[in-house]
């Protein structure tokens, strides 16, 4: 069952909402879902349902709350897409990292948390998953077509958390030069698994013109394999 209306204390004051989806047994390892640039939209709730069907607790915080509660955009509407891109340009990654840290603390204190706490992010959320991996406050990090990695390559050396990143070789946000830089930096760290797919940006969202069922199936299978190896809270680097 999808639960809305949760409220999480933010660092520095304020509160933000989150969507929660429990597995059939009512508890399990927690996977935070970090949104695309389009907010907590139907795709994010689809991801929550998928995770719950696999035995995980899905928890998706509203990372745009500083601009207003419950903001979401339709990626297939040109006007809304432009607004989402504008919000992304103004978004501060450090705010997202702080909110995900607060979400980890919230999740770890709840009776539904039985195991570790991981993060899966898409697009903007993929970039945040990379930052969380570098900060080391989740037990597992997965990013789908994260943006801007080539601007923060030095962070790759800091990653000790088991991490996995799924990228498309046809992603228009990632140049050929950036692909090589990302590959070199990520493959130098054994904690990071990097996978490239013959696909474009947003290949895992069914409503995207770049949707690739084959890439999505493979990426999701690899993600689940990593999540099922996740260690309990407090065991990073052990």
From Swiss-Prot:
Q: Which GO MF terms are attached to this record?
A: carboxymethylenebutenolidase activity
Its Enzyme Commission number(s) read 3.1.1.45
The portions of this protein that span the membrane are none
Q: Which UniProt keywords apply?
A: Aromatic hydrocarbons catabolism, Hydrolase, Plasmid, Serine esterase
Q: Could you give the subunit structure recorded for this chain? A: Monomer.
Q: What additional remark is attached to this entry?
A: Carboxymethylenebutenolidase is specific for dienelactone and has no activity toward enol-lactones.
**Designated name of the protein:** Carboxymethylenebutenolidase
The species this protein belongs to is: Pseudomonas sp. (strain P51)
Tell me the gene name.
Answer: tcbE
